[in-house]
Amino acid sequence: MKLFVLIALFGLGFAQHNPNTRDGRTAIVHLFEWRWADIAAECERFLGPKGFAGVQISPPNEHILVSSPWRPWWQRYQPISYNLCSRSGGENELRDMITRCNNVGVNVYVDAVINHMCGAGGGEGTHSSCGSWFNANNKDFPSVPYSNLDFNDGKCKTGSGNIENYGDPYQVRDCRLVGLLDLALEKDYVRGKVADFMNKLIDMGVAGFRVDACKHMWPGDLDNVYRRLNNLNTKWFPGGSRPFIFQEVIDLGGEPITTGEYVGLGRVTEFKYGARLGELFRKWNGQKLSYTKNWGEGWGFMADGNAVVFTDNHDNQRGHGAGGASILTFWDPRLYKMAVGYMLAHPYGFTRVMSSYSWDRNFVNGKDENDWIGPPSNGDGSTKPVPINPDQTCGDGWVCEHRWRQIMNMVQFRNVVNGQPHANWWDNGNNQVAFGRGNRGFIVFNNDDWALDVTLNTGLPGGTYCDVISGNKDGGSCTGKQITVGGDGRAHFYINNSEEDPFIAIHADSKL
């Protein structure tokens, strides 16, 4: 019996590590703060045809409306209820988007905020995205309903009621994260309300969840909630499929709470990945790309099958969260494209690409005073649509990194080489490196201050290939560089260090 229970335990967690992607698709994109109507259109016109596996959406539940500062992005992370009406749209628009994305093979992953409700200073009234009344002062949220009995205040031992010391795991789990009212997830009633919210989304067709702030919840409480979740909707997924769970746990080392406590329940965000990747491409702290021959677990990251990896996310591109100044973002486009290219070419982890909006940064003593600014919006605070320009970029302040040719084409590269081993490594001892993926793909980087000029074994069949970084394969022709691979698998590469994009990628489907 014990053995059976162990297998059942392990089996459930293991199933929750599976992203349930379709048709050999391998990378998801976070369309941060996009409206549901725009995501639905993007699935149909771009994400589906271009081979993206899925989209991570911003929290869909009712949230507080903050006036000072004006409608910041982080108001989405302060729930008022589990009603499905948010800054991105209402329940009907959400359902329509989930259906339309699923119909073109693109999964939807929900950012689930279940650790807390709004901030203790959230006040009383109907300043919420659906107009529900609430009173944060006495912890009254009748639209759930939650009352003061459903929060952790009695368990928290700090004077302020907030987390004061990250060295104390009890504080981190039982006290308020930056003043946010901390739900008592040990209570059966609260667990039930959270599971009902998640199950409604599963029944609508979502494929899984990014679970926010998991470090601040006890693993046993999360396990209980996950066990209550329904299997995925069989209209789009095989019978018995479990929701994909990936948990936000910031663990850069140095704290008692580690990712290891959560990997049995689902995948976990590997924040070390983007922090190290940024250092490597910036060449900080003596780092060199030549040191990445054993990139992945060899660098002290969690096991491959447990990791969700990303260059940047919505927090750390603003200096919040983890990684500090080393994090590469769209503000550093040349290095950013290389770093994302490296991530998408390398077999380690399940990959997430960021899609951002720009804002007017204002650095004072190294801190961006405008890191709160919400998405492009109208005077009334409503989020603007995402317009697509004739050149396929986005307008109105939406950055759309996922549409940049170099990133879009590397998502396709990852699909083409899926399942192939890391092979044919080469480096120059500095910041020129190359590696292949079996006999399906090969990529070369020059991050040195001098030209790369070398003949390498690619492992690819002989022929002429289109470099998908400098251009696109268009029928039988190529709009970028062409690379000739000999019958022996060898090819000559030249990359000047002054090029806009000093890297080259070729793969089986880019053969002319």
Curated annotation (Swiss-Prot):
pH effects: Optimum pH is 7.1.
- Where in the chain are disulfide-linked cysteines found? 43-101, 85-130, 156-175, 394-400, 466-478
A GO molecular function assigned to this protein is: metal ion binding
One GO cellular component assignment for this chain's record is: extracellular space
Q: How is the cofactor bound?
A: Binds 1 Ca(2+) ion per subunit. Binds 1 Cl(-) ion per subunit.
Catalytic residues, chain numbering:
212 (nucleophile), 248 (proton donor)
Kindly list the residues the record flags as site (Transition state stabilizer): 315
- In this protein, the residues bearing a glycan are 496
Protein name as it appears in the record:
Alpha-amylase
